Structure formats: structure tokens, C-alpha cells
């Protein structure tokens, strides 16, 4: 600002120099003073800038507390000047302190101990098998004992792989309890998937998540429960699917057991449902699923069907004749029968064709009582009454199955409240188990539950006797 005013004053005086010489002489002292003032101001600022040098905010006390040794300020200034003059701009190496040396010593000790423990661990993991049981559990039947590099590496890989089986193997070796005695046992075991076969879940912005039952689901479960031990095996976690299974069978009358994702085997990025862990005879086990990967270990026991997308259909009802026929035949192994169908996904249509051929052959063999005269048929023809065809054994089985289903539904409706009350009593009885007792003694087993049920039955019988008196 001051410089601009002085320049303006000089220009105005020089412009009027030729016109007013007397004025020039009068103003020149003022000009000289202003110029001297300006030059003195600039000199003062330059000297102050030279005197003021940048100072570090880190003093000696702060550096000492941080663990850095004192550095001579003269050496520091000289080094900074040398760095400024050099074009390479190398960074000055910081002097190592006692704490730095201590850290390096501890790090070297840690690396050395880690190396020693690592070598010892590898040697221990590659040792000979402790027992035949361990060899079987590690799936190392083909790996013998010995200390050759190949055998040691194979045992090491088997043992290291077993450390991660917690995340890939099922929670238990036997997913189901032992089967009941023969007189109380159903002929076959039916393993069905839950999602996209029995139910379908859908999400939209208006309603959120909604889950729908497939048409004919209640009849499918109720009718086949008299022939099969039904096991629902879901690919989702128990926390998501457990409530859904309870909604499908609130009285626990149709579904014998429910398994979830925790019971699956994870291998090569696939969720596999291993039927060999069900504690059941594979020759009498049938699995229906919508994913081929789920049946990767036992494809001969499985029927892979198409996913249900939520549209109305009658597929569950159409599956009943084949499954009923399979359960009512005196077969020891269902796998040859299942593998006799070329396309298992279209097993309903192929079974219907076989049934029609069998029915035609039955009519030929038993039509008109093999050509023998029958008075009843003759009178019926005279009266115009249609002659009834002889029933196939399969028709008789279906009539008997339908009658049994109706009786069971009637019994279930009459005693539904009793079932719910008994279930609530069991929950109250075993709900008193504390966490300490659960950890120390474990969960109640089947025998304890049976004892409680027997005790409840005796109490109810005593109450009924007292009521009659």
C-alpha cells in the first residue's frame, strides 16, 4: 500500500515537471523523505526475515522422553546444509537407540523360538500312527508307518487336515439315534429336503420375506408317515429352519427327525448330505432333493427333482403312488429299483407308464376269472349293471392306506390338546435344567425322557382311577 502511493506521487511530480518547475522544487524534499522511508522499511523487513529462522517444535526434553539421544545442534545444522546442497537428497540415517537394539534382540529371540517350535511340531505331526483307530479316523489306511520322507509327509498332511474338519464335517458321527425295535419300525426311511421342495420363500419390497407351503404338503407327510420314517434335511441353518419345521408338524406326528446345515459335510465348496451318518441301513433309505451336490456321496439312494418356484402344482400328490409302492414291496435294497429308472427327475411319469402296463397285464390274466363262467357277472350283464373289475393288490394297498390315514387324522384331532399339554409339560420339566447341570451332566437322553413320560402316564392313570371312584 505504501509502495503504491509513493509511485503514484513520483509519477504525478514528473508529469508536472515541465509545466511547474517551482512546484517541483517545493515537492522534492517530500519525495526524498518518502523514498527514504520506503527504503528503510524494506531494509528493516529484510533484516527481520534474515534473523528469524525456522525452529523445531521438538525440544530436548521431549526427545529425551521419547527415547532419542541428544544430537548436537551444530552437527544437525551442518547436516541439514549438506543435505540441501546435495542433489541426490539422501535421507540421513537415524542413530539406533538402546531401545531399538532391545527390540531387535527380542525379535530375533522370537523368530528363533518360532523356528524351533515349528520344526518340533512338524516332527511330532509326522510321527507314526498311535493306533489303528487314529489311522481310520484320519482316513489313512493307505499310509503305513515308517520314517521315509513320503510317509512322513502323508501323515503330516492327514493330521493337519484333521485340524480343520471341525468346520467341514458334521457335528456328530451319528446324526440320528439308533432305530427302534423291528416291531415298531417303519419299513423305510425317507429323507426330504425342505427349501424349494416342501416350501418356498420369497421376498419383495411390499411384504418382505414370505414362506409358502407346497400344495398337498399336509397330505404328503400324513399319508407317507405310516410307511416311512420321515427325516427333513434342510440346507439352511437350524436357527432359520427349525421354526418352519415345527409349523409343518406342530404335533410331531409325521416328521420323525429334522436335520439342518450343521449336519452337512462341506467338501470342495459343496454342501453334501451324507446318508451314511444317519445310523440307518442305506439299502432302506431314500432321499429326495433338488440339488445334485447334496447327493454326491450316495447318488444311488437319491431322487433329484426340479425346484419348486411357488406356483400351484400337484407334484407331491403324484409322488405318493411310487413311494407307497416302494414301501409296500418286500425288498431288502431299494437302490436297484431306483436305478432301474432312466431319468429319476421324471420318475412319476415313468412309474405311471409301468403301472398302466402292469394293470393291462392284470386285466388279461384276471379278466372274466380267466374265461370261467360266473353267475354274478352273467346276471349283472343281463340287468345292465357294469361288471366290476378285479382289484389289483396295489389298489387294495391304497384303499387300506387311505383308511389308515383317515383313522389317524380323526385320532389326531380328538387328542390334539393332550399332545400339546404333554409337550408343554416336558418343556417345563426339562426347562429346569441349569447351565451348570447341562455342562457337567449333559443333555437329557432318550431313557430319561422315557422315564418322565412313563411317570406322567402313571400319574394320569391314577387320576383317572380316582375319578371313577
Swiss-Prot record:
Keywords: Membrane, Mitochondrion, Mitochondrion inner membrane, Protein transport, Transit peptide, Translocation, Transmembrane, Transmembrane helix, Transport. Residues 126-469 are mitochondrial intermembrane. PROSITE patterns: FCP1. CDD domains: HAD_FCP1-like (cd07521). Residues 17-108 are mitochondrial matrix. GO terms for biological process: protein import into mitochondrial matrix. It is found in: Mitochondrion inner membrane. SMART domains: CPDc. Residues 1-16 form a transit peptide. PANTHER family: DULLARD PROTEIN PHOSPHATASE (PTHR12210). Belongs to the TIM50 family. Essential component of the TIM23 complex, a complex that mediates the translocation of transit peptide-containing proteins across the mitochondrial inner membrane. Required to direct preproteins in transit and direct them to the channel protein TIM23, and possibly facilitates transfer of the translocating proteins from the TOM complex to the TIM23 complex. Component of the TIM23 complex, at least composed of TIM23, TIM17, TIM50 and TIM21. Interacts with preproteins in transit. This is Mitochondrial import inner membrane translocase subunit TIM50. It comes from Candida albicans (strain SC5314 / ATCC MYA-2876).
Amino acid at each position: 500500500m505504501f509502495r503504491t502511493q509513493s509511485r503514484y506521487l513520483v509519477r504525478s511530480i514528473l508529469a508536472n515537471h515541465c509545466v511547474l518547475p517551482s512546484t517541483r522544487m517545493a515537492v522534492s524534499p517530500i519525495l526524498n523523505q518518502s523514498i527514504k522511508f520506503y527504503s528503510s522499511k524494506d531494509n528493516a523487513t529484510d533484516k527481520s526475515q534474515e534473523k528469524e529462522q525456522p525452529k523445531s517444535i521438538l525440544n530436548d526434553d521431549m526427545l529425551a522422553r521419547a527415547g532419542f539421544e541428544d544430537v548436537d545442534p551444530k552437527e544437525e545444522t551442518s547436516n541439514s546444509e549438506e543435505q540441501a546442497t546435495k542433489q541426490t537428497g539422501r535421507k540421513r540415517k537415524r542413530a539406533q537407540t538402546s531401545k531399538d537394539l532391545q527390540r531387535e534382540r527380542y525379535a530375533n529371540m522370537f523368530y528363533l523360538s518360532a523356528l524351533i517350535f515349528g520344526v518340533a511340531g512338524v516332527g511330532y505331526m509326522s510321527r507314526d500312527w498311535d493306533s489303528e483307530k487314529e489311522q481310520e479316523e484320519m482316513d489313512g489306511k493307505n499310509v503305513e508307518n515308517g520314517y521315509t520322507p513320503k510317509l512322513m509327509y502323508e501323515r503330516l498332511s492327514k493330521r493337519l487336515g484333521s485340524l480343520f474338519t471341525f468346520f467341514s464335517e458334521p457335528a456328530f458321527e451319528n446324526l440320528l439315534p439308533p432305530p427302534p425295535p423291528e416291531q415298531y419300525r417303519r419299513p423305510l426311511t425317507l429323507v426330504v429336503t425342505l427349501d424349494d421342495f416342501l416350501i418356498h420363500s420369497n421376498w419383495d419390497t411390499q411384504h418382505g420375506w414370505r414362506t409358502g407351503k407346497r400344495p398337498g404338503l399336509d397330505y404328503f407327510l400324513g399319508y407317507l408317515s405310516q410307511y416311512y420314517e420321515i427325516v427333513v434335511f434342510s440346507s439352511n441353518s437350524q436357527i432359520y429352519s427349525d421354526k418352519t419345521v415345527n409349523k409343518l408338524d406342530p404335533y410331531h406326528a409325521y416328521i420323525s427327525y429334522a436335520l439342518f446345515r450343521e449336519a452337512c459335510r462341506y467338501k470342495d465348496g459343496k454342501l453334501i448330505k451324507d446318508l451314511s451318518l444317519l445310523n440307518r441301513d442305506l439299502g432302506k433309505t431314500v432321499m429326495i432333493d433338488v440339488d445334485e451336490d447334496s447327493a454326491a456321496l450316495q447318488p444311488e439312494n437319491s431322487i433329484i427333482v426340479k425346484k419348486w418356484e411357488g406356483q400351484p402344482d400337484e407334484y407331491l400328490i403324484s409322488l405318493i403312488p411310487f413311494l407307497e409302492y416302494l414301501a409296500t414291496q418286500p425288498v431288502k435294497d431299494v437302490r436297484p429299483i431306483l436305478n432301474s429308472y432312466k431319468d429319476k427327475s421324471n420318475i412319476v411319469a415313468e412309474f405311471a407308464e409301468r403301472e398302466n402296463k402292469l394293470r393291462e397285464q392284470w386285466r388279461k390274466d384276471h379278466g372274466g376269472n380267466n374265461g370261467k363262467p360266473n353267475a354274478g357277472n352273467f346276471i349283472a350283464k343281463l340287468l345292465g349293471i357294469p361288471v366290476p373289475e378285479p382289484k389289483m393288490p396295489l389298489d387294495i394297498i391304497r384303499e387300506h392306506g387311505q383308511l389308515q390315514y383317515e383313522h389317524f387324522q380323526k385320532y389326531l384331532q380328538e387328542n390334539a390338546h393332550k399332545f400339546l399339554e404333554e409337550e408343554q409339560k416336558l418343556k417345563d420339566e426339562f426347562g429346569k435344567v441349569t447351565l451348570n447341570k447341562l455342562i457337567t451332566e449333559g443333555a437329557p437322553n432318550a431313557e430319561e425322557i422315557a422315564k418322565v413320560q412313563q411317570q406322567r402316564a402313571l400319574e394320569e392313570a391314577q387320576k383317572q382311577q380316582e375319578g371313577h371312584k
